[in-house]
């Protein structure tokens, strides 16, 4: 109550921010008349003036009002488009490490030119990041004339470019590209073997379009560069044949009754669990097929890999649905993004799940991969000196942007008032009733000439609606992952009179739906159109536009609520752009995923009490509130999972930064001779300490062991025992010096043989290759540690603290191994000439060519397990004495109930 009163008196934080920025907009507007009088050359010369001022000590904030005024004037001359005041506000927000929420159609692309130009003046590089190659190319080509008019260069960074093309793109003042490509280039640069192979400059300023999609929806998706591991496709195929024999549990276990079945599904957590009966059945099936020894358990240590394959196959069959979670195209399983409805070629689920889905669908099973380098988008983007983003829907996730990335969200007002009508949800009992009402609504819109955009949550649902419309003879276009090639064309004409477009989630995001259709695309389709043709197209469009506005504008029709309110708002935001007329409504049924899992009991009870009949819908604020609360619960849970992922990845990120920094130092150094000498001394002293303990008597020395180790691991034959027998004055310290001296002389003789420059180059190549190999093994060990760390909760230990402690120990071991392995190779290898080093480089390049780029979804289940385990750490452990009691045996307490439903619950 007091909060509302204070907001009324002093305005919200957002209002105060906009008010202070509004004063700067007034300054920019005051410059407009003067800048209009400048010639083109005088306007262009402003860029070099600004750069000189920055070099002489002025800041970007000092030149910002003038720079923004210059961009506005240049845009008027190049594009015949003037930045609105609200776009100036958006530009200032983006320059100040914040997120600008700007409604669809408010000109985010043009707004981005302001901070991109300002930060491009520094010469350090600006990265404008979009969600796909099409948008990156489109925005770069559209804005190139403006930036080049002002003397700034523009680059495009998309997949498939050569090394020099990438370098040129990154050396431009402003580089457009996709989040994946920038991330992969960062990883590749940190796997390079010479400075010439690196393409990126230091990460300076990132401006992210559709920031919610990249920093939130993609946050659980690490970028992974991987190489092929062992082939286990046959095992996946065999395990796949077992799953159809298993039956889903008919109901959940209760105290009174145990549900019949082999596995249970937790839809909220998207997890599947085998029951005791299911485990026994799988063991019998595996034994029959000769994959498990008679009497052996699936849960024994030796069968962990088998259990992993069974769990992956069970998840593939029960939790992942064709045409919802993935599609099969060209004998390949392609993931469908649950947030955008787009396909994601090249992206694979981790932990064997993708191979299990391939086995289920009977397509070619690709090998599992071994991680060579990985990073999450969260940690990649936090490396930029300046980070900003823009989207139409950020306010619902403002807390997460602030908490994870330190980015405040500012809601930018629309240039014209928003007049879209958002109708209350209509809730039906069954999907059939819901779809019948949707078809009826569409027919009503077509009669009025009102265009309709139907938003669905899956490909399956979009195809079902398409079939229903075909039956009713309603002309329509379908926009889903299967038809993404025509995406821009379909979206461009979705605003025509009476048009009906079905779109999965937010496919087509980034392209505006213009009422009456997109006349620009009609002109672009003509080759060398005349002025008369252009005028006619525009006049025809104006008539259609007025007809659509009179019919009520674009009508948004949602067929199901998404887990996130933000995705629903994105769908609604397609209508009502730039003050246009429009409307929206969601149609729901009690069998929709969100309703069934979260909101079902309350709303179903209410509907039954109201005595609803078939075809009747409920429309009430209470229902909308219950649905919104359900969405909030899911959003909170997903935020916790992303936060957990980040906390674990932060540990790996600290180590990644150390390794990459050391790697770059090695690569940039002309010679690493001093480093090798220091490592040699460390290795020798450590080795001697193992066999000749300090300040110990000679009887405790293991001289034969030391001689053998030196010969086997380092190729050095030293007659240490002979020295001791013939030279009575040798003691521990002098012996240590003799060993080091002999080692150094042996190494110097190599240098004399092949030449100093060749050996220096070879040292660097060995050091880098050894570091890469050990880092790869370390990443695999970290993955292994991560997957089972939540089980530490059962031992009353905090999994996060245990992960930090053990990962640090693994890292220390890796650094020790690095020293020993490098010295071992340098001591044993005989370098003949420069050609040996070149051959080593060539082999490494051939290996690089086999490397794959993967994006793998982090398994949320492991993180959920970690949360549960932390809670367990607070409980006292139960120690069993005597014989183990089976879960289905009678409880020893004498109650007559099964042990798992009585005292077994406590364990």
UniProtKB/Swiss-Prot annotation:
Residues 878-887 have a biased composition (Basic and acidic residues). It catalyses: ATP + H2O + cellular proteinSide 1 = ADP + phosphate + cellular proteinSide 2. It is a peripheral membrane protein. SMART domains: SecA_DEAD, SecA_PP_bind. ATP binds at residues 87, 105-109, 512. Gene3D superfamilies: Helical scaffold and wing domains of SecA (1.10.3060.10), P-loop containing nucleotide triphosphate hydrolases (3.40.50.300), SecA, preprotein cross-linking domain (3.90.1440.10). GO terms for molecular function: ATP binding; metal ion binding; protein-exporting ATPase activity. InterPro entries: Helicase_ATP-bd, Helicase_C-like, P-loop_NTPase, SEC_C_motif, SecA, SecA_CS, SecA_DEAD, SecA_motor_DEAD. Zn(2+) binds at residues 891, 893, 902-903. Pfam families: P-loop_SecA (PF21090), SEC-C (PF02810), SecA_DEAD (PF07517), SecA_PP_bind (PF01043), SecA_SW (PF07516). It is found in: Cell inner membrane; Cytoplasm. Keywords: ATP-binding, Cell inner membrane, Cell membrane, Cytoplasm, Membrane, Metal-binding, Nucleotide-binding, Protein transport, Translocase, Translocation, Transport, Zinc. Residues 897-907 have a biased composition (Basic residues). Its EC number is 7.4.2.8. GO terms for cellular component: cell envelope Sec protein transport complex; cytosol; plasma membrane. May bind 1 zinc ion per subunit. GO terms for biological process: intracellular protein transmembrane transport; protein import; protein targeting; protein transport by the Sec complex. Its main location: membrane. Monomer and homodimer. Part of the essential Sec protein translocation apparatus which comprises SecA, SecYEG and auxiliary proteins SecDF-YajC and YidC. Part of the Sec protein translocase complex. Interacts with the SecYEG preprotein conducting channel. Has a central role in coupling the hydrolysis of ATP to the transfer of proteins into and across the cell membrane, serving both as a receptor for the preprotein-SecB complex and as an ATP-driven molecular motor driving the stepwise translocation of polypeptide chains across the membrane. Belongs to the SecA family. This is Protein translocase subunit SecA. It comes from Shewanella woodyi (strain ATCC 51908 / MS32). The lineage of its organism: Bacteria, Pseudomonadati, Pseudomonadota, Gammaproteobacteria, Alteromonadales.
């Amino acid at each position: 109550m007091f909060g509302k009163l204070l907001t009324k008196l002093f305005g919200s934080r957002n209002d105060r921010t906009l008010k202070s920025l509004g004063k700067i907009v007034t300054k920019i507007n005051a410059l407009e008349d003067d800048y209009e009088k400048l010639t083109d050359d005088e306007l262009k010369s402003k860029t070099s003036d600004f750069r000189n001022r920055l070099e002489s000590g002025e800041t970007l904030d000092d030149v910002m009002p003038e720079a923004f005024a210059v961009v506005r004037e240049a845009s008027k001359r190049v594009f015949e488009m003037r930045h609105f005041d609200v776009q100036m506000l958006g530009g200032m927000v983006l320059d100040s490490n914040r997120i600008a929420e700007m409604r669809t159609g408010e000109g985010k692309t043009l707004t981005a030119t302001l901070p991109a130009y300002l930060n491009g003046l520094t010469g350090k590089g600006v990265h404008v990041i979009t969600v796909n190659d099409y948008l990156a190319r489109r925005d770069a080509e559209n804005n190139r004339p403006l930036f080049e008019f002002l003397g700034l260069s523009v680059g495009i960074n998309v997949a498939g470019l050569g090394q020099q093309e990438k370098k040129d793109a990154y050396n431009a003042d402003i580089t457009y590209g996709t989040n994946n490509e920038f991330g992969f280039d960062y990883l590749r640069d940190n796997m390079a073997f010479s400075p010439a192979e690196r393409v990126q400059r230091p990460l300076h300023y990132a401006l992210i379009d559709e920031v919610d999609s990249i920093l939130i929806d993609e946050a659980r998706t690490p970028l992974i560069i991987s190489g092929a591991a062992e082939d286990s496709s046959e095992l996946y195929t065999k395990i796949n044949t077992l799953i159809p024999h298993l039956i889903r549990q008919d109901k959940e276990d209760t105290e009174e009754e145990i549900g019949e079945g082999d596995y249970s599904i937790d839809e909220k957590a998207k997890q599947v669990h085998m029951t005791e009966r299911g485990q026994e059945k799988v063991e019998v099936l595996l034994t029959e097929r000769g994959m498990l020894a008679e009497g052996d358990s699936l849960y024994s240590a030796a069968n962990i890999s088998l259990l992993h394959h069974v769990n992956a196959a069970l998840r593939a069959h029960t939790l992942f649905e064709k045409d919802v979670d993935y599609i099969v195209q060209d004998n390949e399983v392609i993931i469908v993004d649950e947030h955008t409805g787009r396909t994601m070629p090249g992206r694979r689920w981790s932990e064997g799940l993708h191979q299990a889905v391939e086995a289920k669908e009977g397509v070619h099973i690709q090998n599992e991969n071994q991680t060579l380098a990985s990073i999450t988008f969260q940690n990649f983007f936090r490396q930029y000196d300046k980070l900003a983003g823009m989207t139409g829907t950020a306010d619902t996730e403002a807390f997460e942007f602030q908490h994870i990335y330190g980015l405040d969200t500012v809601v930018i007002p629309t240039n014209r008032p928003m007049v879209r009508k958002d109708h209350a949800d209509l809730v039906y009992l069954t999907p059939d009733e819901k779809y019948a009402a949707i078809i009826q609504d569409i027919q009503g819109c077509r009669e009025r000439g009102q265009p309709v955009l139907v938003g669905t949550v899956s490909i399956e649902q979009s195809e079902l609606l398409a079939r229903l419309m075909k039956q009713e003879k309603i002309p329509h276009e379908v926009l889903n992952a299967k038809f993404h090639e025509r995406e821009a064309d379909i979206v461009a004409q979705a605003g025509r009179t009476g048009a009906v477009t079905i779109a999965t989630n937010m496919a087509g995001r980034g392209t505006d739906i213009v009422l009456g259709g997109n006349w620009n695309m009609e002109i672009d389709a003509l080759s060398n159109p005349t002025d008369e043709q252009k005028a006619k197209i525009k006049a025809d469009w104006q008539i259609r536009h007025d007809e659509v506005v009179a019919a009520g504008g674009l009508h948004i029709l949602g067929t199901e609520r998404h887990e996130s309110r933000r995705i629903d708002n994105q769908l609604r935001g397609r209508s009502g752009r730039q003050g246009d007329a429009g409307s929206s409504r969601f149609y729901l049924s009690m069998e929709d995923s969100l309703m069934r899992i979260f909101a079902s009991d309350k709303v179903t009870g209410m509907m039954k009490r109201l005595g609803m009949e078939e075809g009747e819908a409920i429309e009430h604020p209470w229902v909308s509130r219950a649905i919104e609360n359900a969405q909030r619960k899911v959003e909170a849970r997903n935020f916790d999972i992303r936060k957990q992922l980040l906390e674990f990845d932060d540990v790996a990120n600290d180590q990644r930064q150390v390794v990459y920094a050391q790697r770059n130092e090695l690569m940039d150094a002309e010679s690493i001779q001093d480093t090798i000498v220091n490592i040699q001394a460390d290795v020798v002293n450590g080795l001697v300490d193992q066999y000749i303990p300090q300040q110990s008597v000679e009887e405790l020395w293991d001289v034969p062991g030391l001689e053998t180790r030196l010969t086997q691991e380092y190729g050095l034959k030293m007659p240490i025992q002979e020295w001791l027998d013939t030279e009575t004055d040798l003691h521990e310290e002098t012996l240590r010096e003799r060993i080091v001296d002999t080692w150094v002389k042996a190494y110097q003789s190599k240098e004399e043989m092949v030449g100093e420059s060749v050996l220096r180059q070879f040292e660097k190549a060995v050091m880098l290759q050894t570091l890469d190999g050990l880092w790869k093994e370390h990443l695999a060990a970290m993955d292994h540690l991560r997957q089972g760390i939540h089980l530490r909760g059962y031992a009353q230990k905090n999994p996060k603290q245990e992960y930090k402690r053990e990962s640090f120990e693994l890292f220390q071991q890796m650094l020790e191994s690095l020293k020993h392995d490098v010295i071992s190779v340098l001591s044993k290898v005989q370098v003949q000439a420069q050609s040996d080093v070149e051959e080593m480089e060539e082999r490494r390049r051939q290996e690089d060519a086999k490397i794959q780029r993967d994006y793998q979804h982090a398994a949320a289940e492991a993180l959920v397990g970690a949360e549960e385990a932390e809670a367990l750490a607070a409980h006292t452990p139960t120690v069993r004495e005597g014989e183990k009691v089976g879960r289905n045996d009678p409880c020893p307490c004498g109650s007559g109930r099964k042990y798992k439903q009585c005292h077994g619950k406590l364990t």
